[in-house]
Amino acid sequence: MNGDLNRLMARLGYQFQDLSLLELALTHRSVSRHRNYERLEFLGDAQLGQIISVALFEQFPEAAEGQLTRMRASLVRGQTLALVARELGLGEYLVLGGGELKSGGFRRDSILADALESIIGAMLLDGGEPRCREVVLAWFAPRLDAISPQSAQKDAKTRLQEWLQARKFELPTYEVTQVEGLAPKQTFDVQCSLDNVQQIFIAQGASRRKAEQEAASLALEWLEQQYD
């Protein structure tokens, strides 16, 4: 296990002094109701918001409060955190119960996002605020460099459409692939298809509109990484 954790710490860019904190940060509730990452997630969520808030405040001295709020929301939302977690390869190190493991929980956006926040909480306790901030800012550096008050004002579907039109690509298509539950507690799975690049992006939301926005955001982030 320690060898695996050493590889993970290399990916994170942080060396834990207390490995039990890292192990706890990787343990899902499906393994243990009492010893899991939820408390660390609570701490990491607050710390991440503070780190990103300060970074945006310093990076955009002329931005209004509303613009800062929208940029922060874009950076700390679940889909973005899940992408960062995938870039770090976090999913393969998660400790899941049998049911979650069989259902592919290590690929689920919500679990990946929660685990990333729990890692942040664990780093805060293990190494203190300055070191935690340094590591988190390194993870988010490409997104902080790319974001602007103007881009944060437009929703993801609009920004994706503008990006595609500017390059004379075909516009995306959206399709609901699954609806779970009963109203008003339904969840919608939507896929966004980009024919030009032969890619499909799938997201889930509490409404069709929210799911489409999340799928569009995933598509746009992938395109910007591949082409810009």
Curated annotation (Swiss-Prot):
Residues 155-225 form the DRBM domain. Its cofactor is Mg(2+). Keywords: Cytoplasm, Endonuclease, Hydrolase, Magnesium, Metal-binding, mRNA processing, Nuclease, RNA-binding, rRNA processing, rRNA-binding, tRNA processing. Gene3D superfamilies: 3.30.160.20, Ribonuclease III domain. GO terms for biological process: mRNA processing; regulation of gene expression; rRNA processing; tRNA processing. CDD domains: DSRM_RNAse_III_family (cd10845), RIBOc (cd00593). GO terms for cellular component: cytoplasm. Its main location: cytoplasm. Mg(2+) binds at residues 41, 114, 117. The active site is at 45, 117. One of its GO terms (molecular function) is double-stranded RNA binding. Its EC number is 3.1.26.3. The keyword ATP-binding does not apply. PANTHER family: RIBONUCLEASE 3, RIBONUCLEASE III. Digests double-stranded RNA. Involved in the processing of primary rRNA transcript to yield the immediate precursors to the large and small rRNAs (23S and 16S). Processes some mRNAs, and tRNAs when they are encoded in the rRNA operon. Processes pre-crRNA and tracrRNA of type II CRISPR loci if present in the organism. HAMAP family: RNase_III. Homodimer. This is Ribonuclease 3.
